[in-house]
Amino acid sequence: KGGMVYLDGANLNALMGIAKPGHMGVDVLHMNLHKTFSTPHGGGGPGAGPVAVKRALSDYLPLPRVTRRGERFELEGNGPKSVGRVRSFFGSFGILVRAYAYILSLGGDGLEDASRMALLNANYIRKKLEKSYHLAYNEPCMHECIFTDRVQQRSGVTTLDIAKRLLETLPESQAQVA
């Protein structure tokens, strides 16, 4: 009692259009846009990670903030309780626009469909590979499943060997990106 809940929204593919973190008691949520909303990351950067908070925490968000006043959106630069600026200028604005365009292009139904496909794909691959790889958790999964190389280690095969082989099977153009 009295604590707050932080959700690492590194991958929201299983939740979009299906669940509302705020309704689950989440007070703070950060979103890594590259995993869920089709934006570049790493070598393809820059990355961006918007933060959503419950109203009680909004005074502490970094500046500047986009606020809605009636039908208009404005930049708010003052906030005595704010942590201040965490990045120069307006952050990775272009990445935010790209993620927003992706969200608009899919719409609510499309986001939900993407989540349902992520759930289906993860559980499909889990079932297809569970006899060949050690499944770390033997239960239905959300957007991803976790295997270990325990079975392959008996033959001297490591996770790195498996990763390299996966790259070798990619078409030339995709292998260079990976």
Which residues does each PLM region occupy?
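Active-site lining segments that contact anionic ligands and/or coordinate catalytic metals
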Residues: 2-4, 26, 36, 43-48, ...
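Conserved PLP-enzyme active-site core in the AAT-like
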Residues: 1-70, 157
